[in-house]
């Protein structure tokens, strides 16, 4: 807390506060130089596990081939279904409540990637698929991510609750797209 107050009083740019250390210096234009590192771009958060995965800084996560340059896809570490994938924007976006109307295409692209990944894994019964987002404060990671689950008819009791269609804590991708358009 004291370090944060010192950093604010030193005139650090807001982007630099998170990476500021005792060795931080401020140049005449107010840029951040923490141990020789440049400030993080606003679309990257070094404390976010999904940002690190997108930046290929987590060698333990296998990225699935994704033909969209703005998105990544990988298997959920605690799968609720035989096919449980996460489709994640490379740029840091907080959650589904922070989305704007002009980001409908992003969500549509996430759904397209999810369907493509399922097809590549020989799952084509799209009537037995659930795609959606957890609503804050029920997001385990504060980086937008689409859950792609199949087959839905084989979800366990708890998973049926956790991924319940358009509940207080989970919204389907189709419903989110509809809400963003209105």
Swiss-Prot record:
It is found in: Cytoplasm; Nucleus. Residues 1-42 are annotated as: Disordered. GO terms for molecular function: adenosine 5'-monophosphoramidase activity; identical protein binding; nucleotide binding. Its main location: cytoplasm. The keyword Nucleus applies. Keywords: Acetylation, Cytoplasm, Hydrolase, Nucleotide-binding, Nucleus. The active site is at 145 (tele-amp-histidine intermediate). It is an enzyme of class 3 (hydrolase). A motif (Histidine triad motif) lies at residues 143-147. It catalyses: adenosine 5'-phosphoramidate + H2O = AMP + NH4(+). It holds the Pfam family DcpS_C. GO terms for cellular component: cytoplasm; mitochondrion; nucleus. It comes from the Eukaryota. AMP binds at residues 76-77, 145-147. Residues 21-30 have a biased composition (Polar residues). The keyword Cytoplasm applies. Its EC number is 3.9.1.-. PROSITE patterns: HIT_2. Residues 49-160 form the HIT domain. The modification N-acetylalanine is found at residue 2. Exhibits adenosine 5'-monophosphoramidase activity, hydrolyzing purine nucleotide phosphoramidates with a single phosphate group such as adenosine 5'monophosphoramidate (AMP-NH2) to yield AMP and NH2. Hydrolyzes lysyl-AMP (AMP-N-epsilon-(N-alpha-acetyl lysine methyl ester)) generated by lysine tRNA ligase. Hydrolyzes 3-indolepropionic acyl-adenylate and fluorogenic purine nucleoside tryptamine phosphoramidates in vitro. Forms dimers to octamers and even larger oligomer. Interacts with CALM1. Belongs to the HINT family. This is Adenosine 5'-monophosphoramidase HINT3. The gene is HINT3.
């Amino acid at each position: 807390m004291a370090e944060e107050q010192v950093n604010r009083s030193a005139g650090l740019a807001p982007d630099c506060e998170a990476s500021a250390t005792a060795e931080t210096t401020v140049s005449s234009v107010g840029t951040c130089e923490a141990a020789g590192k440049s400030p993080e771009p606003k679309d990257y958060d070094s404390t976010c596990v999904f940002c690190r995965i997108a930046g290929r800084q987590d060698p333990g996560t296998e990225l699935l081939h994704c033909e969209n340059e703005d998105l990544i896809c990988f298997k959920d570490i605690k799968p609720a279904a035989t096919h449980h994938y996460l489709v994640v924007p490379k740029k840091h976006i907080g959650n589904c409540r922070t989305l704007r109307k002009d980001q409908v295409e992003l969500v549509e692209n996430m759904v397209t990637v999810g369907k493509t990944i399922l097809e590549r894994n020989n799952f084509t019964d799209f009537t037995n698929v659930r795609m959606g987002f957890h609503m804050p404060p029920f997001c385990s990671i504060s980086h937008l991510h689409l859950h792609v689950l199949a087959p839905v008819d084989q979800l366990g009791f708890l998973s049926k609750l956790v991924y319940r269609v358009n509940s207080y804590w989970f919204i389907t991708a189709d419903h989110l797209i509809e809400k963003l358009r209105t």
